[in-house]
Design a protein with these regions (language model features):
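Leucine-rich repeat
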Residues: 1-450
Length: 450
C-alpha cells in the first residue's frame, strides 16, 4: 500500500513538472512581467456587468501567475465585500491577507449588504476594525455604515482619503441620524456623499470639497452648502423642500461661480426658488426633477441661465407637464446646449408640434432651436405627428446651414430617443425612414411603452 501511494505521489509530481514545462512554452510565458501585470490590472478593473475578476483568479492558473499576482500590490488595492452572516468569519480572515498583499497601495473600499439587521452590523464592525488598521492608505470609502462603526472611525487619520460615500441603515430617520466624525482627519477629501444624514450635524472641510451629495434639505440649507463650499464643482441635492416660498436676496453675486454641475430633486414645487437665489456663471450641467402635481415653472431655469450668462451644455428636466410658453423661452436662452433630456410624468402638455418645428433646421422664422444639440431624450406625451417628428430628426442628423443665417453651424444630432406611454402611430414611410437613419449611423429610437 505504501509503495502504491509513493508511486501515485511520484506521478503527481511528474505531472506537475510536465504542466510547468508545457506552460513555459506558451506565448504568455514570454511576456515581460510588467506587461503581464498590466493585463492582470486591466482585467480586475473591467466593468462589463459580470462577476468581478479578483487576483485570486490568477493565482489559481499556475505557479508563475500566482507569484506575479501575489507580489503585485496594485492588484489588491480594490476591496469590494458583500457582507453576509454566512461568510463573516472567512471574509475577515481573507481581508487581513488581502491588506497584507496590498502593502502601501491606496485602498478603494466598497462594503455592501442585502440585509440590514444587527448581525450584519456586527459583521460590518468586525470588518471595519480590520480596515482601520490601514486607514492611512484609504483612498475611497463607499459603505453602509451603522452607528456601531462610528467610534472606530473617530480617532483615526486618513491622509490619502479623497472620496467618502456612507449611508445609515434604511430604517434610520435622517433628522436624527448623525454622520461619523472623521472628515476633518482627511486633508485631501474632495468628494462626499452623506445622503440620509442630518445636515446640521455634518462637520466637513467645506472649503476644499469639489463634489457633495445629500438629501432632505431646505432651500436655506442648500444655500448654506453653496456658501460654505467656494471650490464646489458638482452638487447633488435630493428631496429639497421649502416650508414657504423663499424670496431671492436683494442683490445677487457670483459667489458660487465654481459650480459646474447642479442636480436637484424637489419635494415641493416652491423649492424651485433655490434657482432664483443663486448665480452660477460656470454652470454647464443642470438637472431639475419634480413629480408633484403643482409643478414648477421652467422660467426659474430660464432666469438662472440669463442671470448667470453660463455656457450650459446639458439640461435635464423632469416635471408634470411642459407648456410651450414656459419651455420654449428657456430653450431659446441656451443655444450652447448639446444634451437635452425632457421627462413629462403627467399625461398632458408634452412634446408639441411647435417645439418640433422650431427645432427644424429649415424653419422660416429664424435659426433652429438648440443648434448645437447632439443628444436628445424625451419621455412623455407627444402632440406631434410621427412624420413631422422624424422629418425634423432626419434633418438634424444631416443638417444644412440655417435657412436665414448661413453663419450658424448646426451640429449633427447623433442620438435621439423618444418614449411615450400611449400608442403612437408610426406609418410605413416613417418606419422606413427610421431604418435608413439607423443604418446611416444615427442612434434613433421611437417607442411606446403601452
Amino acid at each position: 500500500m505504501a509503495s502504491v501511494e509513493a508511486m501515485m505521489e511520484n506521478l503527481s509530481w511528474r505531472r506537475t513538472n510536465l504542466r510547468r514545462k508545457i506552460n513555459s512554452l506558451s506565448s504568455t510565458s514570454l511576456l515581460p512581467a510588467e506587461i503581464l501585470t498590466e493585463i492582470f490590472r486591466l482585467t480586475c478593473q473591467s466593468e462589463d456587468g459580470g462577476l468581478p475578476v479578483t487576483p485570486l483568479f490568477f493565482g489559481g492558473i499556475c505557479k508563475d501567475w500566482r507569484e506575479t499576482a501575489w507580489s503585485t500590490p496594485l492588484l489588491w488595492n480594490t476591496i469590494s465585500l458583500h457582507v453576509s452572516r454566512k461568510a463573516h468569519g472567512s471574509q475577515v480572515q481573507l481581508l487581513r491577507d488581502w491588506l497584507l498583499r496590498a502593502n502601501s497601495s491606496p485602498l478603494f473600499i466598497k462594503l455592501t449588504s442585502d440585509d440590514e439587521h444587527e448581525s450584519i452590523f456586527c459583521s460590518l464592525r468586525a470588518i471595519m476594525d480590520v480596515l482601520v488598521t490601514r486607514s492611512t492608505y484609504w483612498n475611497s470609502l463607499d459603505s453602509l455604515l451603522p452607528p456601531q462603526c462610528h467610534d472606530i472611525l473617530k480617532n483615526n487619520h486618513f491622509p490619502m482619503l479623497t472620496s467618502v460615500s456612507v449611508r445609515p441603515p434604511k430604517g434610520t430617520i435622517s433628522t436624527f441620524s448623525e454622520p461619523p466624525n472623521m472628515f476633518l482627519s482627511a486633508p485631501k477629501l474632495l468628494d462626499v456623499d452623506l445622503s440620509g444624514y442630518n445636515f446640521s450635524a455634518m462637520v466637513l472641510p467645506w472649503e476644499q470639497l469639489r463634489r457633495f451629495k445629500t438629501q432632505f434639505l431646505t432651500v436655506a440649507e442648500c444655500l448654506k452648502v453653496l456658501k460654505r463650499s467656494p471650490s464646489l464643482k458638482e452638487c447633488h441635492l435630493e428631496s429639497v423642500y421649502s416650508p414657504e416660498i423663499f424670496p431671492p436676496p436683494m442683490s445677487l453675486d457670483t459667489f458660487y461661480s465654481e459650480l459646474e454641475h447642479l442636480d436637484i430633486t424637489l419635494i415641493k414645487g416652491a423649492a424651485i426658488s433655490l434657482l432664483d437665489s443663486i448665480t452660477l456663471p460656470s454652470l454647464t450641467h443642470l438637472r431639475v426633477h419634480y413629480s408633484g402635481a403643482a409643478g414648477f415653472t421652467v422660467s426659474a431655469i430660464h432666469s438662472l441661465v440669463l442671470r448667470s450668462s453660463c455656457n450650459l451644455q446639458r439640461l435635464y428636466i423632469e416635471k408634470q407637464r411642459l407648456d410651450d410658453e414656459d419651455l420654449l423661452p428657456c430653450l431659446e436662452s441656451v443655444p450652447s446646449l448639446s444634451h437635452l433630456r425632457l421627462v413629462v410624468v403627467g399625461d398632458s402638455a408634452g412634446l408639441s408640434k411647435k417645439c418640433v418645428s422650431m427645432m427644424h433646421p429649415s424653419r422660416d422664422s429664424g435659426p433652429p432651436l438648440l443648434p448645437k444639440l447632439t443628444w436628445f431624450h424625451y419621455e412623455g406625451p407627444i402632440e406631434c405627428d410621427s412624420h413631422s417628428l422624424v422629418d425634423m430628426l432626419s434633418e438634424r442628423w444631416c443638417p444644412q446651414p440655417a435657412k436665414n443665417d448661413n453663419t450658424i453651424l448646426i451640429a449633427s444630432l447623433n442620438t435621439a430617443e423618444i418614449v411615450t406611454h400611449v400608442r403612437y402611430e408610426l406609418t410605413d414611410e416613417v418606419e422606413c425612414k427610421m431604418r435608413w437613419l439607423t443604418k446611416a449611423g444615427m442612434a434613433l429610437s421611437i417607442r411606446s411603452l403601452l
